[in-house]
Amino acid sequence: MMTETLQIRQIDDANKFQFISLLLIGDESEKMIGRYVDRGTLYAGYIGETAVAVCLTTDEGAGVVEVKNLAVRHEFRRRGIGRRMLAYIESINSGMTIQLGTGETPSTLRFYESCGYVYSHRIHDFFSDNYPAPIIEEGITLTDMIYLAKKAGHQSAD
């Protein structure tokens, strides 16, 4: 398969909400997105002039950058776009620890682990405490937020 050219651009604060449909793929609660979007930096991945992916990061201090939202349009998945978005975030934050939180969905955990992220910690009952309705992915009702981390600029040990 031919690798599509993915251009990644930082989005101005004033334009972040133009990407709400993509952000809602990564986090289905507009209220939750509102809790981090203003303090985050948004990057959009384009193929041609079409925005196909987003990644929103926050500076958590102490050398930690958190990926709050990573999303790829459904029809563009399984093409390495999410992996390229993460690699870009790592490249511009070399030497920093990149952390991210996700539900206990096996395919999502496998994806991040294949990118070199390792288990860090969990926040018990995060989804049930912060979302009005249950979130079900791959038949699993999400309860805990699983955090994974990676030192940017370091290869995984495989």
Residue ranges and their predicted role:
Residues 111-113, 117:
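Conserved active-site tyrosine of GNAT-family acetyltransferases
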Residues 70-77, 103:
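A short, internal acetyl-CoA/4′-phosphopantetheine-binding micro-motif in the GNAT/acyltransferase core
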Residues 10-17, 22-34:
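Helix-loop element at the rim of GNAT/NAT acetyltransferase active sites that forms part
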Residues 92-104:
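Conserved GNAT acetyl-CoA-binding A-motif
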Residues 99-101, 118-141, 145:
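Conserved catalytic-core motifs of GNAT/GCN5-like acyltransferases
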Residues 76, 80-88:
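Conserved acetyl-CoA pyrophosphate-binding loop and the N-cap/start of the following alpha-helix
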Residues 1-14, 146, 154-158:
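Conserved N-terminal entry element of GNAT/NAT acetyltransferase domains
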Residues 44, 50-59, 63-71:
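Conserved beta-strand in the GNAT
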